[in-house]
Amino acid sequence: MNVEVVDFQAPDAPESFTRSLRTTGFAVIVNHPLPHELVQQIYDEWLAFFDSDAKYAYRYSDGDQDGWFGPDVSETAKGNTVKDLKEFFHVYPWGQYPAEVSDAALRYSRTATEIAVTLLGWVHDHTPDEVRDRLSMPLPQMMDHSTRTLLRVLRYPPLRGDEPDGAVRAAAHEDINLLTVLPAANEPGLQVRDLAGAWHDVPCDFGSIAINAGDMLQLATGGYFPSTTHRVMNPTGESARRSRLSLPLFLHPADDVVLAEGRTASSFLAERIAELRSQDRKTA
């Protein structure tokens, strides 16, 4: 599977990135403006937070979907029957934020969003005219006045050996949004599925960022950019006794953006959240 590693500063970066996203749904970028030290700081601070009782004061708001989601309410991937082995905190600029950590995650969210919007501009500029003609507006313009972009601080706890049969850290799924920005986690495990159904490890070199297309981009472009299936597998050996932390930023358009005829970003998001809740009820 030819997931390209793209130098963010290279003259041909926009074309190379868009080509990889088109053919695989994924790309890996290096030499980008996101400080490695900032990512490590967030991993250290939030691991301590997840290990503390402080998290219980920030339980998620059902309406706004901000705050801490414990393992008891963790997601069940669409089409799956077992909950993922994870807990996470949804960070929005307007939402709950723990007093027990610094503002590092907020600073990361702003920088990652800027990178994602730049990448979205690259995609728009290097998309064929016949695909761009499908769009209700230029891709970067979809982000104007958006309040939906989400940073998920994810913690996959150490495995204890008593996990339910078939449970994995993150079952095979696709993302809902336009683009996802995912810096290398502190442990490997992320895999992506190619068109033939084979699974491939995504590079975990610290300092690299994996980018994948989501369902909204696939819908808006009529399938030109595929929303690629990915998963996080359970580790073995010593790695199984360590937490895995991850910082996906999900780039979402403004609510009123029309993705396809009769489907706005808001209605599509509501539809997908309803599907996830339905799956969760089946596994409760």
Regions found by a protein language model. Give the residues of each.
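Peripheral, non-catalytic segments flanking oxidoreductase cores
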Residues: 1-284
